[in-house]
Amino acid sequence: VTGVGKVKKGEIVSTGGLKPGDEIVMTKWAGLEGTSIIAAEKEEKLRETLPQELIDVAKGFKEYLSVIPESKIAMEVGVSAMHDVTEGGVFGALWELGEASGVGITAHLDKIPIKQETIEVCEVFHLNPYMLISSGSMMIGCEKGNLLVEKLNEAGINAAVIGRATEGNDRIIVSKDETRYIGPAGSDELYKI
């Protein structure tokens, strides 16, 4: 697939612009697109254990797949890097952001926004929701993460500061007393079902 477009000079923000000390803001929720796809394509299996209302909500996650609104707000606040969270999910996107920028990443699992519907759908198929295709979410690097979150929330877009860029190359997820090193995304969790 090839895409062509026009951008004003000086307005391109790449995945590779993150600097040590930058905060990492994540928009919306982990696993959005994957949850929507699974709920639509595996509805019968999900009905065996989950209520129809939850499945319907999960199918509706497709309404969140555009990242244009948050991109515009991020540009107004000022950012160093932006990366859409697609195949490989949140963990894959964090690794890609760090790799493209030549920095380390420290992110906190308990700060990563996730919907209960995603957790429950993933439990049925034994999937890691943080490694599930998450189109509709963005990772944004900036100096003023809390300001960006505030502006996004004012516009009705869920967002959270989930970590920061560090010196070095370690890309880690901190969960309570555990530290997990992440690497390049392998096959997306969606392909396991």
Predicted regions and their residues:
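Helix-biased detector of long, well-ordered alpha-helical tracts
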Residues: 1-193
